[in-house]
Each structure stands twice: as C-alpha cells, then as structure tokens.
Design a protein with these regions (language model features):
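Non-catalytic, mostly N-terminal accessory regions of nucleic-acid modification and defense proteins
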Residues: 1-80, 139-152
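Conserved S-adenosyl-L-methionine
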Residues: 59-163, 168
Length: 169
C-alpha cells in the first residue's frame, strides 16, 4: 500500500491496456511450473530496471548495480542473520539479493532486517516497488533522504553494510 505514485490511480488511465498487460505477463511460460511461479514479476521488474539503467548510461548507475556484482558482494559478506544496511540503496538490488542468499541457505525471510535510504525521489519509489513486488519488508524511510545530510538511521547498529560501487563517476 502506498508504493505506487498517486497518478497511477487517475480515472483516465486505460484500464483495458493495464488488463492486457497483466494477461500478457500471466501467459508467459518460462521453465517449469515452480520456476514460473517463483518471483516472475520480480524478474520482469529487474529486467526493466537493467534496461532503463542501460538507456540512462552513466546516470543509470545511480539506481542500478549489475546483478552479477550484487551477487558477489552479498556472497562475500554472507548475511545469514542480522541487520543489512545500504546507505544509498538505489532500487534495492542489494536487499533482494540478500534475501535470496538467506533463502538459498535454508534461512527464512525474516532472518535479516533491511535498512536503507535513497536521496533520489524516483529511485526511492523504485526501491519501494522492488521490495513490495517481492514481499520484502524493509525500512528505507518514510521518504527519500540523503545519507550525508539527513541520516534516517542514526542509531542503527548494522551487522552488514552494502553499497553500490561508484559506477556513475
């Protein structure tokens, strides 16, 4: 609730097109039944994030770290349990991969707690959407905020800190 911007609820939005889009995604058959049901919407969302980042060029690094790099970073820190913090969380890829890591190692979704913040308002919404699509509870603040000027987690004692390498420099 409250993840989508208010303009997605506007009366003039073509609901027929939206329904067709949902039907299209529902009809996609990739792999076996278990693979199809497992995070299909999340994978589609991630695909589009990567495409948008590529189209943005250097600026795309503000919100998207390639999945291969995120996976290596998460596997290096091995966040089995505890608090995971990303001070400039972008679209939330570090959080998604951390949850995936826990599940792949027979952990439960609640074994880690997610904390982060993002200064760009659009990217902050992308992160909220990314977490919501995957059913991940996280605390990325009630609104966008710059970690340097408005730290939303001043008292947090994180067990793991992940951050995007500065690809956009």
């Amino acid at each position: 609730k409250g993840v989508l911007p208010k303009n997605y609820a506007r009366p003039d939005l073509d609901k027929t097109r939206l329904g067709e889009l949902v039907d299209l995604f529902s009809s996609i058959k990739v792999g076996d039944k278990e693979s199809r049901s497992k995070d299909m919407l999340g994978r589609v969302y991630e695909y589009f994030l990567a495409r948008f980042a590529g189209a943005e060029g250097k600026g795309g690094g503000e919100f998207y770290t390639p999945k291969s790099i995120v996976k290596v970073l998460v596997e290096m820190i091995e966040p089995y349990k505890g608090r995971v913090y990303d001070p400039c969380c972008g679209s939330g890829g570090m959080f998604v991969q951390s949850e995936t890591f826990v599940e792949e190692h027979q952990g439960r979704k609640g074994d880690i707690s997610i904390y982060g913040q993002e200064s760009n308002p659009t990217t902050w919404r992308l992160c909220n959407m990314n977490l919501a699509i995957r059913g991940i509870d996280g605390n990325i603040g009630p609104n966008h905020a710059d970690t340097f000027h408005n730290d939303l987690h001043k008292t947090l004692k994180a067990d793991y800190i992940l951050a995007n390498p500065p690809f956009n420099i």
